[in-house]
Amino acid sequence: MYYRSIKSEIIQTICTYHEEPSLIFNKICRTKTETLLLESATVHGKKNIESMLIIDTAIKISCFKNIVEIEAISNNGLFLLNTIDLKILKKKSTKIKKKKSNVLEIHFPIFNYFTDEDKKLFLTSVFDALRIIKKSIKNPEKSKMGVFFGGILSYDLISSFEPIPRVFNSKYNHPDFCFYLSENLLIFDHKKKKCKLQTNIFTDNEEEKLNILKRIKIIYNQIKEINSKKKNNRINTFNDFKTKNKKWVDCKNDSKVYKNKVKKMKQMILNGEVFQIVISRKFFLPCPYPLESYIFLKKNNPSPYMFFMQDRHFVLFGASPESSLKFSSITRKIEIHPIAGTRPRAFSSIKKIDINEDNKMELAMRINSKELAEHCMLVDLARNDLSRICLPGSRVVSDLMKVVKYSHVMHLVSKVEGVLRNDLDIFHAYQCCMNMGTLTGAPKIRAMQIIAEEGEIRECYGGAIGYFTGKGDLDTCIVIRSAYVRNGIACVQAGAGIVLDSIADEENEECKNKAMAVINAINKTL
């Protein structure tokens, strides 16, 4: 298919390295929306690996059911919005409306759920909006990744592709997906202690190009100033806040209600409805300082995936241990990392890890038949998901049941990978694999239908956050161990996988243990 090409000029500026990108976020983006910080760290050494910070967004792409809204955030983005050729979409039974001078709305046809599984991947869908924008931008050959899109894919997006009832119990209209196309992106390589600013220029207006160059200089100087005044650039971190008013409120699913739900799910399993299902609890608490809470969470619970997304309507932050979907455009290798099997860490009376008791916890998890059966079931589910999109014979389980330990819990982790078919892209892959079995259950579709029948909207929880690039790479994590903040109130959601052998008290405690790292981080800033 032909896409009219829009040339992207990329300027890379070497900036002064800083070991703590959240300080730069605080300095440059504290009051800016449509900003995003993505980070990764080693679990045991607590060492930063890489950070990527969208300082300025060119365009924002949001999806609400079958409507995709493309909004130009900058003049540079407005040029891109007015240049993208959307005629291809008009041929696919879509309607395009100009909502404002800087906002386009694309109305997609209702998806036909009951088509053949392979044909379903090629039906017109809301992913075509992301696909066309990505393919319309010509990336410089010398650029390693090309343009950069960062954002979220909500759990409830699945209702646009599968016969899963939509839940409407929230007064807020949360997007099914929301991505920012970066205009100014800071990239930190913490191993090499290097930092560079990547600027994307789409406009051909010389005056606007000069404005962008001025913006580069401002950002460069702001970063330099932070580094020259490290001692005086501390954020009001957790130590500066009173912690007397610690409180968290359980919404709807208190312990008694949750245990009853576990019993109900076990009966459905016994009736043959599902083999396993993930039901969750929501905890609400005040969160007036989400950035400070994120910093505390990052310090005490370093994870492979950490994120702080600041939208005009919400803030989402977290430290997730679990990859959602990862794809390399060079090798075409696609990966899923199922996590199932959880035990709390063992602490001594002085709140330090008791190594002897911790090892006993690990052994108990490794030999627990319920945990092993649940994990194998989800590894098999990941294999099935990849079999639909990978080349025959390329799918393998490269890691099986490794133990990974975090601040409050330990998990069993596996890795399933394969080679993506040549006729498919990252959007086909995500469409086929969402939502991950570790947050839904098995069989996946029926499990999600039952979760929807519970009448509790999940929004971000159980969805994915991460990025994709102009060159076609994708790296996302599952949104867990996170807080979704609106109007100063955080919602922390955590779930447990229910099987026939589940014990209600243990599953209830597992939810609390999983939520505790985030709740503690927020409480430290109250």
Swiss-Prot record:
Activity regulation, free text: Feedback inhibited by tryptophan.
Q: Where does Mg(2+) bind?
A: E374, E510
Catalytic reactions of this protein:
chorismate + L-glutamine = anthranilate + pyruvate + L-glutamate + H(+)
What cofactor is needed?
Mg(2+)
Q: Which UniProt keywords apply?
A: Amino-acid biosynthesis, Aromatic amino acid biosynthesis, Lyase, Magnesium, Metal-binding, Plasmid, Tryptophan biosynthesis
Aminoacyl-tRNA synthetase as a keyword?
no
Q: Which Pfam families match?
A: Anth_synt_I_N (PF04715), Chorismate_bind (PF00425)
The processes (GO biological process) annotated in the record are: L-tryptophan biosynthetic process
Write the Enzyme Commission number(s) for this entry.
4.1.3.27
Q: Molecular function (GO) terms listed?
A: anthranilate synthase activity; metal ion binding
- Name the source's superkingdom: Bacteria
| Pathway given in the UniProt record | Amino-acid biosynthesis; L-tryptophan biosynthesis; L-tryptophan from chorismate: step 1/5
Report the cofactor remark: Binds 1 Mg(2+) ion per subunit.
Q: Which InterPro entries does the entry mention?
A: ADC_synthase, Anth_synth_I-like, Anth_synth_I_N, Anth_synth_I_TrpE, Chorismate_C
According to its UniProt record, this protein's enzyme class is lyase
Binding-site residues for L-tryptophan, renumbered to this chain: S40, P304, Y305, M306
Q: Does the keyword Nucleotidyltransferase apply?
A: no
Q: How does it assemble?
A: Heterotetramer consisting of two non-identical subunits: a beta subunit (TrpG) and a large alpha subunit (TrpE).
> Which NCBIfam families does the entry mention?
PRK13564.1, trpE_proteo
The Swiss-Prot or TrEMBL record describes its family as follows:
Belongs to the anthranilate synthase component I family.
Which PANTHER family does the record match to this protein? AMINOBENZOATE/ANTHRANILATE SYNTHASE, ANTHRANILATE SYNTHASE COMPONENT 1
Q: What does this protein do?
A: Part of a heterotetrameric complex that catalyzes the two-step biosynthesis of anthranilate, an intermediate in the biosynthesis of L-tryptophan. In the first step, the glutamine-binding beta subunit (TrpG) of anthranilate synthase (AS) provides the glutamine amidotransferase activity which generates ammonia as a substrate that, along with chorismate, is used in the second step, catalyzed by the large alpha subunit of AS (TrpE) to produce anthranilate. In the absence of TrpG, TrpE can synthesize anthranilate directly from chorismate and high concentrations of ammonia.
UniProt name for this protein: Anthranilate synthase component 1
Source organism of the structure = Buchnera aphidicola subsp. Tetraneura caerulescens
Corresponding gene? Answer: trpE
